């Protein structure tokens, strides 16, 4: 979900051996791409960079001969059914790319996420609440195994709507 379908994000696919996510239990190797989630299956031996046109996780999974469910199991934070990949926003021909699926229509101001950003500080910078930021950019949140994680999917190079004042 980290802005899936853009070159800056990555998706983990475990090689042959089924793995389950284990947060903070090991350190990924030196070839771990920037943007890998801390709760990705660990250790991971194969990394895949999402390409424009990859579609959803099922299409990517089929490239590696695994099921969509396998991808979800090793990379739970990347996937929220039914289609986790971002699409261009409605009514915003001038919107930057990438913009996550479900971004509010008619956004008046955009912010490009930088490394180290988090929802609270970004929202404060633009005089809005973190709840407003997430409401306008719902793809920031994820539900994993019944637990809701607000602002889990804030990834560098993705774009956030930070103002709908004239909307």
From Swiss-Prot:
GO terms for molecular function: chitin binding. Residues 1-16 form the signal peptide. Induction: Expressed during in vivo infection of insect hosts. Transmembrane segments: none annotated. Disruption phenotype: Does not affect virulence to host insects. It comes from Beauveria bassiana (strain ARSEF 2860). It holds the Pfam family LysM. Might have a role in sequestration of chitin oligosaccharides (breakdown products of fungal cell walls that are released during invasion and act as triggers of host immunity) to dampen host defense. Residues 109-162 form the LysM domain. The gene is Blys6. This is Secreted LysM effector Blys6. SUPFAM superfamilies: LysM domain. The keyword NADP does not apply. InterPro entries: LysM1-like, LysM_dom, LysM_dom_sf. Keywords: Chitin-binding, Signal, Virulence. In plants, chitin acts as a microbe-associated molecular pattern (MAMP) that is recognized by lysin motif (LysM)-containing plant cell surface-localized pattern recognition receptors (PRRs) that activate a plethora of downstream immune responses. It comes from the Eukaryota. The keyword Signal applies. The LysM (lysin motif) domains are small globular domains involved in binding chitin in eukaryotes. Blys6 contains one5 LysM domain. Belongs to the secreted LysM effector family.
